């Protein structure tokens, strides 16, 4: 089934707690994940909370990558939403799994904007002129 995008909703467990609390490193690894997926980075913003935790977003031309960390639990919640056929969110997922040193993960892939649900003919090109 064709869709406008793919959205990975990922749970990362037993991650490196120091990595999860390092805002500069998290931003660097999220941008690298976007790059490895084939995405085009538009902008990013990240924030470190006190006493610990990081939240951030990398806005890409093809949608976004987000992260929220709980270093005290070794846990990160990650969303990787990409549109188009040239970007692979699974490459971003694999990069982040390694970078955060996650020992366990759970991930679900959702099709966003399924052609059959919004009335786009299956043989339509992904990009259309409006």
Curated annotation (Swiss-Prot):
Q: How does it assemble?
A: Heterotetramer of two alpha and two beta chains arranged as a dimer of alpha/beta heterodimers.
Cysteine disulfide partners in this protein: none
Species source reads Thermotoga petrophila (strain ATCC BAA-488 / DSM 13995 / JCM 10881 / RKU-1)
What does the UniProt cofactor note say? Binds 1 pyruvoyl group covalently per subunit.
- In which pathway does this enzyme or protein participate? Amine and polyamine biosynthesis; S-adenosylmethioninamine biosynthesis; S-adenosylmethioninamine from S-adenosyl-L-methionine: step 1/1
InterPro entries hit by this protein: AdoMetDC_C, AdoMetDC_fam_prok, AdoMetDC_N, S-AdoMet_deCO2ase_core, S-AdoMet_deCOase_pro-enz
- Alphabetized PANTHER family for the sequence: S-ADENOSYLMETHIONINE DECARBOXYLASE PROENZYME
Q: Which keywords belong to this entry?
A: Autocatalytic cleavage, Decarboxylase, Lyase, Polyamine biosynthesis, Pyruvate, S-adenosyl-L-methionine, Schiff base, Spermidine biosynthesis, Zymogen
Record's function text: Catalyzes the decarboxylation of S-adenosylmethionine to S-adenosylmethioninamine (dcAdoMet), the propylamine donor required for the synthesis of the polyamines spermine and spermidine from the diamine putrescine.
Q: What is an annotated GO biological process for this record, any one?
A: spermidine biosynthetic process
Query: Required co-factor?
Result: pyruvate
Family in the record: Belongs to the prokaryotic AdoMetDC family. Type 1 subfamily.
Read off the SUPFAM superfamilies from this record: S-adenosylmethionine decarboxylase (SSF56276)
Q: Which residues form the active site?
A: 63 (schiff-base intermediate with substrate), 68 (proton acceptor), 83 (proton donor)
What's this protein's name? S-adenosylmethionine decarboxylase proenzyme
Carrying Pyruvic acid (Ser), the residues are 63
> What GO molecular function annotations does the UniProt record carry, in alphabetical order?
adenosylmethionine decarboxylase activity
Reaction(s) catalysed by this chain, per the record, are:
S-adenosyl-L-methionine + H(+) = S-adenosyl 3-(methylsulfanyl)propylamine + CO2
Q: Does the keyword S-adenosyl-L-methionine apply?
A: yes
């Amino acid at each position: 089934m064709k869709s406008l995008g793919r959205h990975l909703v990922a749970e990362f467990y037993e991650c490196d707690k120091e990595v999860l609390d390092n805002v500069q490193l998290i931003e660097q690894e999220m941008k690298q994940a976007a790059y490895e997926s084939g995405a085009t980075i538009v902008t990013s913003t990240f924030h470190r909370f006190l006493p610990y935790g990081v939240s951030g977003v990398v806005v890409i031309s093809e949608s976004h990558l987000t992260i929220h960390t709980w270093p005290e639990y070794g846990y990160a919640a990650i969303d990787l939403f990409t549109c188009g056929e040239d970007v692979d969110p699974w490459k971003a997922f694999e990069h982040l799994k390694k970078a955060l040193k996650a020992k366990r993960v759970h991930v679900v892939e959702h099709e966003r904007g399924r052609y059959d649900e919004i009335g786009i003919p299956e043989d339509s090109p992904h990009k259309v002129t409006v």
